[in-house]
Curated annotation (Swiss-Prot):
Disulfide bonds: none annotated. GO terms for biological process: rejection of self pollen. InterPro entries: Self-incomp_S1. This is S-protein homolog 6. Coiled coil: none annotated. The lineage of its organism: Eukaryota, Viridiplantae, Streptophyta, Embryophyta, Tracheophyta. The gene is SPH6.
Length: 136
C-alpha cells in the first residue's frame, strides 16, 4: 500500500513540473509583481536580490519606478531583499518580499520610498504601511 501511495505522489509531482527557459520549476506558486517607487527629492540607489537572482544596481530618479515579476516557490519560502542608498550613504537593507509575510498580503506588492522610510502597499489596505525606517 505504501508503495502505491509513493508512486502516485511521485507521478503527481512529475505532472506539476514545468519547463521554463531551460530550467525545471516544480509546482510553482502564484505570479507576483514587486514595484519600488521613489517618492523622494533625491536619487535613490536600489540593489535587489534573492538567493538565486541578483537584479543589479539601479538608480531611481524622483518619481522613478523599478520592478520585477517572479513565481513564489511551492515551499512558500521565496525571499527578495533590497539595499537602498542615497549617494554614498546606506539607507538600509530590507526584506522587500518575504513569502511567509507577503503571499497573503499582495500579488502586486508596491513599495514607496519616502523621507522617513519604506512604505508597503498590497491589495489589502493597511492602517500604517510604514514597514522600515531608514538608518540615520
Amino acid at each position: 500500500m505504501f508503495i502505491i501511495i509513493f508512486i502516485v505522489l511521485i507521478s503527481l509531482i512529475g505532472c506539476e513540473t514545468l519547463q521554463h527557459d531551460g530550467k525545471v520549476f516544480p509546482m510553482k506558486g502564484p505570479l507576483t509583481r514587486v514595484v519600488i517607487y521613489n517618492d523622494n527629492d533625491y536619487l535613490l540607489g536600489v540593489h535587489c536580490k534573492s538567493r538565486d537572482d541578483d537584479h543589479g544596481f539601479h538608480i531611481l530618479q524622483k518619481g522613478g519606478l523599478y520592478g520585477w515579476m517572479f513565481y513564489v516557490n511551492f515551499m512558500n519560502s521565496t525571499l527578495y531583499f533590497c539595499g537602498f542608498s542615497q549617494e554614498q550613504v546606506k539607507k538600509g537593507v530590507f526584506d522587500i518580499y518575504k513569502a511567509v509575510r507577503d503571499s497573503s498580503r499582495c500579488r502586486n506588492c508596491t513599495w514607496e520610498a519616502k523621507e522617513d522610510g519604506i512604505y508597503g502597499y498590497g491589495e489589502i489596505p493597511k492602517k500604517n504601511p510604514l514597514f522600515y525606517k531608514w538608518l540615520m
